[in-house]
Amino acid sequence: MAGQEQQQPQSRDSQVDEDIPEAPPAPPEAQASASTEGVDDLLDEIDGVLESNAEEFVRAFVQKGGQ
């Protein structure tokens, strides 16, 4: 056995997969700002609803004596 050479398996890291698609290009700035404005409007609406619900909750809590 001393005269036999052992073959080592090749590492998979040395092989490059060419089937991996490239990332899509970044969206234009106009689309990004339009999307951001829509999200901002939605967050403002949610904030308003939460504020009105919080006021009602506090009133109901105080009327019940905090129980």
Curated annotation (Swiss-Prot):
Pathway of action: Protein degradation; proteasomal Pup-dependent pathway
Q: Where is this region: ARC ATPase binding?
A: 25-61
Query: One biological process GO term for this chain?
Result: proteasomal protein catabolic process
Explain the post-translational modification: Is modified by deamidation of its C-terminal glutamine to glutamate by the deamidase Dop, a prerequisite to the subsequent pupylation process.
What molecular function does GO assign, one term?
proteasome binding
Q: Where is this cross-link: Isoglutamyl lysine isopeptide (Gln-Lys) (interchain with K-? in acceptor proteins)?
A: 67
Q: Does the keyword Transport apply?
A: no
Name of the featured protein: Prokaryotic ubiquitin-like protein Pup
